[in-house]
Amino acid sequence: MTQQPSRAGTFGAILRVTSGNFLEQFDFFLFGFYATYIAKTFFPAESEFAALMLTFAVFGSGFLMRPIGAVVLGAYIDRIGRRKGLMITLAIMGCGTLLIALVPGYQTIGLLAPVLVLVGRLLQGFSAGVELGGVSVYLSEIATPGNKGFYTSWQSASQQVAIVVAALIGYGLNVTLGHDEISEWGWRIPFFIGCMIIPLIFVLRRSLQETEAFLQRKHRPDTREIFTTIAKNWRIITAGTLLVAMTTTTFYFITVYTPTYGRTVLNLSARDSLVVTMLVGISNFIWLPIGGAISDRIGRRPVLMGITLLALVTTLPVMNWLTAAPDFTRMTLVLLWFSFFFGMYNGAMVAALTEVMPVYVRTVGFSLAFSLATAIFGGLTPAISTALVQLTGDKSSPGWWLMCAALCGLAATTMLFARLSSGYQTVENKL
């Protein structure tokens, strides 16, 4: 029988399983940062705002595919195994990445260009729908007793490494290439780099071992049974979706949308926006395992409640302070404050979500809740934030969207743990 990774091999297991997360976030961040260049290449329009909104709409379309991927691929992983499923998601994600990198512009192939970019995003979204769930469940099942929050936090921590690497590459391009060169062809270079690392990630994932928890399961549910169980637990899925809303909205605001927000709304330089994003990625990387470890010690609920309340009280004031006199220092401080919210909350939230899902549908349940939240909240954050600024004329208006997500997180935490306290669903760890 395949053995669960030993303590000595834990780091290697975490590295192998989170490598796909790295690729996913690397591509998503690039799409957000180079949105203005992608808009000009694939969506020519008289209005820069219209072209940018079309680009963010395509970006968001990938998130609409996530729930479908969560159900289809999540059911496969729960039935066949974690390792095999994660290999398939990586292959699909790689195809989407390659397509976006290679598609000629609108001037070359006309309407086919935006259509192919859309297909690439849909493929990425389909695979990403289960990537986070599959990785989170894998990490939770290899975690040592009392450390599940710390282990699962590395799912998101790996994404922060991708953000830092992508931002460093972008900064290098801005230093070595001119604006016209980046606009015409330079923005594609990071996407090609993403394509080049796909074979390495395949090699890493091939050496993954199946988790002992999955191998010991005597019952392997069929697809119909999985869907029936999900339907019976729709309240848990709904609460889980709202629970994720806080983390996914904050994350996509401080990473994917921030570079565009800094350049087009606050009129900061591209280099300043990239440096801020790098600092945010590093900050996220630090706070995520801290949040997970603290939740292992004091419970998930105190961390989740405390952070959502803090976000509700402080978000609008700090956004007003930023937009009153926007500069590099203020933007850095505000986004690092939001980074603290994200890291602490997400560190506890991922572990909590794996614990409340019924064991036989843990991957599909987690992935569906996460994907719905990402589609409704996170994926649309750039478009909604852009629209809020355009419609209201208030540069701080995206703060209202962040507060809405925090309110969802607070409500979900209250509802979910009230049900757990009443015995609605048993869990495996201290909540």
Swiss-Prot record:
Ranges of the Cytoplasmic topological domain: 1-25, 73-84, 130-161, 205-235, 295-301, 354-363, 419-431
Membrane-spanning segments: 26-46, 52-72, 85-105, 109-129, 162-182, 184-204, 236-256, 274-294, 302-322, 333-353, 364-384, 398-418
GO biological process: citrate metabolic process
One term of GO molecular function: symporter activity
Classification via InterPro entries: H+-coupled_symporters (IPR051084), MFS (IPR011701), MFS_dom (IPR020846), MFS_trans_sf (IPR036259), MHS_symport (IPR004736), Sugar_transporter_CS (IPR005829)
CDD domains reported for this sequence: MFS_CitA
Keyword Metal-binding recorded: no
Pfam families cross-referenced by the UniProt entry: MFS_1 (PF07690)
Regions of this protein lying in the Periplasmic compartment: 47-51, 106-108, 183, 257-273, 323-332, 385-397
Main location: membrane
Membrane topology: Multi-pass membrane protein
Record's GO cellular component terms: plasma membrane
Record key words, sorted: Cell inner membrane, Cell membrane, Citrate utilization, Membrane, Plasmid, Symport, Transmembrane, Transmembrane helix, Transport, Transposable element
Locations listed in the record: Cell inner membrane
Record's function text: Uptake of citrate across the boundary membrane with the concomitant transport of protons into the cell (symport system).
Family listed: Belongs to the major facilitator superfamily. Metabolite:H+ Symporter (MHS) family (TC 2.A.1.6) family.
Other observations noted: Allows the utilization of citrate as a sole source of carbon and energy.
PANTHER family: ALPHA-KETOGLUTARATE PERMEASE, CITRATE-PROTON SYMPORTER
Protein name (Swiss-Prot/TrEMBL): Citrate-proton symporter
Organism: Escherichia coli
